[in-house]
């Protein structure tokens, strides 16, 4: 059945020179499943025809089918993939490639076979996140919002959080090792010393001296959301916040006349509200009452406090205008 159907498809689409789509759609789902079954089943006749027509053409279709069913695939499917013609550069409707899928679905064993087929860790998805971005986000989400990791209709529900802390750390380590060994030249944001300081993890060989790239040009890719300047620009963590989540807000009421303050909690403040950067009036002669509301949660407070530290070892490896906000708690 697969043979006859596949030959018919090849006759009508490949031999006639009609280019098939790279992405899986409902219209072509049946076609992609048939081709995929023949490839995984190592049907020699079909494989020979695909090789004759050109591996690059078949590559797009096979890789698209592979992405479509990646969540339910096992390592055996990956190992049985013939000719190593699957491409890690093919993306799905979300702009994610195979490496993104490995991070999302906790398939760390798949990453061990990535170097044999080639890869590019610098491909962003539609949200602008590389695989390393996703690994960091999983770790930050898991440590910042442990009670909401199973919330519906959020990114937390998309990412599998089984053994979240351990798996996220493993993914970051594996991805960084791949960066060191195979792709040292990527548009990074921070230098190696900064990354090693916060990761407390020394990548395996080769060491820095074995890399021909200058140390100043070799900077690991940290999430954009962890920059202090992002807090100043957006005044919120909207991209990290689960939709509809409520959090407590501390209302601090200062009375300059009596020189004391009263703190109350407001649990009806929405997480998406921006941080109100109002400054208190320091005029002691004023008898007016000044009230300010801050919406810092535990993560905000820790990151702000961390950015104000005077640790000499940190200042030596960080630029003054770009302070990394990933503390030990999140690593």
Swiss-Prot record:
Superkingdom: Bacteria
Keyword entries, A-Z: ANK repeat
ANK repeats: 94-159
SUPFAM superfamilies: Ankyrin repeat (SSF48403)
Protein name: Putative ankyrin repeat protein RBE_0261
């Amino acid at each position: 059945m697969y043979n006859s159907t596949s030959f018919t498809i090849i006759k009508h689409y490949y031999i006639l020179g009609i280019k098939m789509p790279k992405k899986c759609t409902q219209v072509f789902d049946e076609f992609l499943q048939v081709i995929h079954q023949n490839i995984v089943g190592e049907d020699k006749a079909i494989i020979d025809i695909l090789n004759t027509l050109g591996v690059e053409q078949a590559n797009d279709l096979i890789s698209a089918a592979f992405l479509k069913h990646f969540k339910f695939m096992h390592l055996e499917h990956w190992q049985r993939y013939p000719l190593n013609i699957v491409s890690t550069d093919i993306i799905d409707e979300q702009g994610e490639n195979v490496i993104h899928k490995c991070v999302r679905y906790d398939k760390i064993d798949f990453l061990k076979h990535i170097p044999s087929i080639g890869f590019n860790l610098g491909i962003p998805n539609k949200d602008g996140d590389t695989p390393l971005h996703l690994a960091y986000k999983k770790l930050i989400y898991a440590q910042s919002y442990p009670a909401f990791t199973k919330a519906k209709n959020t990114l937390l529900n998309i990412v599998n959080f089984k053994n979240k802390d351990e798996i996220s750390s493993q993914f970051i380590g594996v991805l960084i090792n791949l960066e060191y060994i195979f792709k040292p030249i990527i548009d990074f944001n921070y230098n190696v010393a900064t990354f090693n300081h916060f990761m407390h993890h020394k990548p395996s060989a080769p060491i820095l001296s074995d890399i021909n790239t200058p140390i100043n040009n070799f900077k690991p890719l940290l999430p954009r959301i962890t920059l202090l300047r992002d807090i100043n620009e957006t005044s919120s963590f909207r991209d990290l916040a689960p939709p509809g989540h409520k959090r407590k807000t501390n209302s601090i009421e200062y009375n300059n006349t009596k020189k004391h303050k009263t703190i109350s909690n407001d649990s009806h403040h929405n997480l998406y509200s921006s941080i109100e950067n109002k400054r208190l009036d320091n005029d002691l002669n004023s008898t007016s009452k000044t009230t300010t509301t801050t919406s810092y949660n535990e993560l905000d407070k820790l990151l702000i406090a961390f950015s104000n530290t005077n640790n000499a070892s940190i200042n030596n490896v960080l630029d003054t205008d770009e302070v990394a906000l990933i503390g030990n708690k999140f690593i």
